[in-house]
Every structure is written in C-alpha cells, then in structure tokens.
Swiss-Prot record:
Designated gene of the protein: pyrD
Domain of life: Bacteria
Protein name per the record: Dihydroorotate dehydrogenase (quinone)
PANTHER family the UniProt entry points to: DIHYDROOROTATE DEHYDROGENASE (QUINONE), MITOCHONDRIAL, DIHYDROOROTATE DEHYDROGENASE (QUINONE), MITOCHONDRIAL-RELATED
Entry note: cofactor: Binds 1 FMN per subunit.
Cofactor: FMN
Binding-site residues, substrate: K66, N111, R112, M113, G114, F115, N172, N177, N246, T247
Function (record text): Catalyzes the conversion of dihydroorotate to orotate with quinone as electron acceptor.
GO MF annotations in UniProt: dihydroorotate dehydrogenase (quinone) activity
Keyword Oxidoreductase attached: yes
Quaternary state and interactors: Monomer.
Length: 336
C-alpha cells in the first residue's frame, strides 16, 4: 500500500528524474528510522550457485544502482544478491536525454541510457564504505569511445579493479545501447574475449587468494544457433555462469503503445516470455553444467517460478521492482 502511494508520486515525474530521486532518498534514509518502510526480514531460502551461497535466489539486476550508491538499502530489502553497474573504466554521461520511458500499460520500460556512470574508481569507493550481507555482483562494460576491437581492454581494466570487492563479476556484452557491443557475443570475438577474461581471472585469483566467478550477460535477440554457439564458448572457456537476458529490441508485445517507437532496450513484462525461452534453450544446451541467472519480466512469484522451471538457478528483478516495489521480493521469497 505504501509503495503504491509512493509510486503514484514518482510516476508523475519524468522516468529518469524519478529514478535519480529514488536513489537519493535510499542514500539519505538507509540507517535511519525511515528505512523501516522498506526494510524486510525474509525467510532464508539458501541457494548454492557459482561456488557462492546466496541467502535466497532473488537478486536486483544491474542498471538500477549503477554506481553502487545504495547497496545497503537493497540489502535491507532482503535481496539475496545485488548487482551494481554497469560500470566502465572511465566516467561517461551516456546518451542524450530523454532516454528512459515507462510503458505503464504493459509494465515495461524502454531505456537507451548508454552506460552512464561515474567510473569504476568511484564505484569501488562506494563499495568499500558499504555494510551488507548479501552477495554483491559487479557488472562491467566498455566505454562508448573505446573501439570495439579494443573492448577487451576495458573489461580487463574493470575486472582488475573490482575483483577484490566482488562476489561475482558480470560481463555485459549485450546492451543494445552501446554501438557494436553485441558483436562481442559471436564467434571468434566472443572466444577471444573469454580467453582474456579467464586468463585475468587466474592471475587475480593468485594475487588475491580468492576465486571470483565470471558470469556472461547475453541478449534475448539471438537465434537458436547463436545461443548454441554461445553455450559452446561458455563450456570451452569454463565460464562460471550466464545471465539471461538483457533488454530486447523487439517491439511485438508493445506495438502501438505510447513510447513503443522509442529507440533502446525494452524490459519488463513484455520480455518475460522471450527471456524465459532463452533460459530454457540455455538449460538444454548446458545440461546443468553452468548456472543460469534468469532476468527479464520477473514481476511476480509466478514469473519467477516460470524462470526457475525453465532452468534458472537464480532470478533477478528490475522493471518488476519499479512497478511493484520491495513487496515483490518478499512475495517471491516467501512463496518459494
């Protein structure tokens, strides 16, 4: 009820202004009596995945807390894991505004943010100050002005800097809002990137005395053959996990709606069916050998259960959280 009232106010604002205001308020109120409005004590539903123990299988997807400013707030809401980022080596402002749109009737969101963030060094300082008990994922990407043929260098820079502080590292090669980025999902380009990442992982494991798993985040807009090839690359390179999926460029489910024609990636309920199908295809190809984190349209317990029945070991929420608030996490975890 309280969240519905707050949402009504936030939804009167431009979508990005509402997002920024929410982040400011979470930073301001966490640790004060006001955080009782969103702090939740949830039952333990422990899951072993990627060599880590998650207190429950419901996580916050990357993109909401790009700079790691509100880890404590999301931890207080009971998430089993929180994925911050996407972060790049250098700060960048992202694409021109407006770049975030709500499709309220479909409970969807279109964004073309473009990896706006304050840079990896800023994120690390925020992580070092935070106190939390959930698993922390850090999602890394490349700067827009880094040529795609040198993209691996950006991932390696970020990986080296976040490794010490991450529970796992998510490698984002599937955002539709950075030109050319999705080409890294295919063939030799993917294999070359994964080889470099695994080499760096081994080097950093020796340096820090701990193994931090790597998860690859993929797009929903892939053919069955492309998914099969990605799976072979994941297996061959011993990648620890796969996150399925990022946002979609397809507009079939929202055709004719206000903002449907806006460029960018579509998330939320319109993505649920396709992202779940990708999870199912991954499970078939990977045969349980590599864990799957299912994301895309998880806006209820039933949607989360669909992802898990399709083969997801963990699930993440983002758009569903925007529309339903912390109560969504509670509803999923309590019913598992």
């Amino acid at each position: 009820m309280l969240y519905r009232l707050a949402r009504a106010g936030f939804f009167q604002l431009d979508a990005e202004k509402a997002h920024d205001l929410a982040i400011q308020n979470f930073k301001r109120f966490t640790g004060t009596p006001i955080d009782l409005f969103y702090r939740q004590q949830l039952p333990n539903r422990p899951v072993e995945c990627m060599g880590l123990t998650f207190r429950n299988p419901v996580g916050l997807a990357a993109g909401l807390d790009k700079n790691g400013e509100c880890i404590e707030a999301f931890d207080a809401m009971g998430f089993g894991f929180v994925e911050i980022g996407t972060v790049t080596p250098r700060a960048q402002s992202g694409n021109d505004k407006p770049r975030l749109f709500r499709l309220v009737g479909a409970e969807g969101i279109i964004n073309r943010m473009g990896f706006n963030n304050l840079g990896v060094d800023n994120l690390i300082e925020n992580v070092k100050k935070a106190k939390y008990s959930c698993v922390l994922g850090i999602n890394i990407g490349k700067n827009k002005d880094t040529p795609i043929e040198k993209g691996a260098e950006d991932y390696l820079i970020c990986m080296e800097k976040v490794y010490e502080y991450a529970g796992y590292i998510a490698v984002n090669i599937s955002s539709p809002n950075t030109p050319g980025l999705r080409t890294l999902q295919y063939g030799e380009a993917l294999d070359e990137l994964l080889v470099e990442l695994k080499r760096k992982q081994a080097e950093l494991e020796e340096k820090h005395g701990k193994y931090v798993p790597l998860a690859l985040k993929i797009a929903p807009d892939l053919t069955d053959d492309e998914i099969s090839q990605i799976c072979q690359s994941l297996i061959n390179n011993k990648i620890d996990g796969v996150i399925a999926t990022n946002t979609t460029l397809d507009r079939t489910m929202v055709e004719g709606m206000k903002y449907a024609q806006e460029a960018g990636g579509l998330s939320g309920r319109p993505l649920q069916s396709r992202s779940t199908e990708v999870v199912r295809l991954l499970r078939k190809e990977l045969q349980g050998n590599i864990p799957i984190i299912g994301v895309g349209g998880v806006d209820s317990y039933v949607a989360a259960k669909e992802k898990m029945l399709a083969g997801a070991d963990l699930v993440q929420v983002y758009s569903g959280f925007i529309y339903h608030g912390p109560g969504l996490v509670r509803d999923i975890v309590k019913n598992l």
